[in-house]
Structures are given as C-alpha cells and as structure tokens.
C-alpha cells in the first residue's frame, strides 16, 4: 500500500471494487457462502487480479476488510492518530464517514460480524478494544461509561445513513469539546 502526498493510503479502484463486493456478498449470501467466480462477476475484476491482491482464500479477503476497518474506519494507523494529536478530529471523522459512503456494506458487515464466534468476529472485537484504548489514551480521566459515550457518538456519526458533511460538523464540535475538556494531550481549535 502506498501513500499520497497527504499521507492517505492509496489502493487502486480494483482493490476497492473487490473488497466492497466481497463484503456485500458475504453479508447477503452468508459467511463464506459465495465463490470467487461470483466475486469476480460482481466486482468486474478478473480472478487473477483478485488472487494478486488477496490470495486464493475468501477469508483473506474478509480479513482485509477487517484491516481496513481498523486502519481507516477506527483510525488506528499512525497518520490518523497524529490527526487526533493535532486536534484534527473533523478531518479524521470525515475520512471515516467518506469511507462508509463509498463502502455501503461496511457498516452492516461490522455490525453483523462483530459478535460472531469466528476469526472475523474476534478481530472486530479486538479493534473495538483498540479504539477504547485509543480514546483512553487521549482522554485518560474518562470512566468506562464516558468512553462508551465517545465510542457510540463516533460510530453513530460515521454509520448514520442520513449524515451530511454539515451534520458531521455539529457532531465533531461536540467531540472536540469533550477532548478539550478532558484531554491533557490535545488542545483542539474550536470554531465559534
């Protein structure tokens, strides 16, 4: 994976078509109850290119979906953590929201599989714990209920199907107030 001038991860269009189609097929047909041929047809990407990106395993494709959720949706990569440190919450949340807009089944995948007793479910629950740790690192004085409030606000913002960039701005301002009040590490710039 390469990064552009702003440090955003760049994956080509074929990667996203395959990932989006695999997540949709898995959600609609059931866990791993689809074929690579169906995936190729749906994504309009050749099987050889699918194998190049993901290998021959359907599970490896879904694991890549979990990786994307961790890095891009939850923001566990270095660049996104740095954005939080710089007080750029709106930018970080907007990137997560835009990903959900481009990958409409990502939310369903996450919500459906997070408690499944399999490798995907376990990985998603692990990402939740990592996000809780990230919030705790930035807001060390918050108790568990307050961290859950930040978590639910964050995921509500990015998963809400009727959100707009304008509504995101209002929600992010709320989170910025929480961070400015409780975080010794971050001094976000609040707009009036």
Q: Where in the sequence are the language-model features?
A:
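N-terminal intrinsically disordered/low-complexity leader segments
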Residues: 1-13, 188-192
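N-terminal positioning helix adjacent to the helix-turn-helix/winged-helix DNA-binding module
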Residues: 7-21, 146
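Short, well-structured alpha-helical segments
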Residues: 16, 90, 94, 143-155
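Helix-turn-helix
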Residues: 17, 25-60
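Hydrophobic alpha-helical connector segments
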Residues: 77-102, 150
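Amphipathic alpha-helical packing segments from all-alpha helical-bundle domains
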Residues: 78, 114-148, 170-180
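Amphipathic alpha-helical segments used for helix-helix packing
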Residues: 94-122, 159-160
């Amino acid at each position: 994976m390469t990064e552009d001038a702003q440090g955003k991860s760049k994956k080509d269009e074929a990667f996203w078509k395959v990932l989006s189609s695999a997540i949709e097929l898995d959600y609609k047909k059931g866990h791993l109850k689809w074929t690579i041929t169906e995936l190729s047809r749906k994504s309009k990407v050749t099987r050889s290119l699918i194998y190049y990106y993901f290998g021959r395993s359907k599970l490896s494709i879904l694991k890549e979906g979990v990786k994307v959720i961790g890095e891009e949706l939850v923001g566990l990569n270095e660049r996104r953590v740095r954005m939080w440190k710089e007080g750029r919450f709106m930018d970080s949340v907007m990137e997560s929201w835009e990903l959900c807009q481009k990958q409409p089944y990502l939310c369903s995948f996450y919500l459906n599989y997070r408690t499944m007793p399999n490798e995907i479910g376990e990985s998603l629950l692990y990402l939740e714990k990592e996000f809780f740790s990230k919030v705790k690192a930035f807001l060390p004085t918050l108790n568990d209920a307050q961290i859950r409030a930040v978590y639910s606000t964050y995921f509500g913002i990015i998963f809400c199907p009727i959100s707009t960039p304008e509504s995101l701005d209002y929600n992010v301002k709320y989170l910025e107030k929480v961070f400015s009040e409780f975080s010794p590490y971050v001094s976000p710039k609040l707009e009036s």
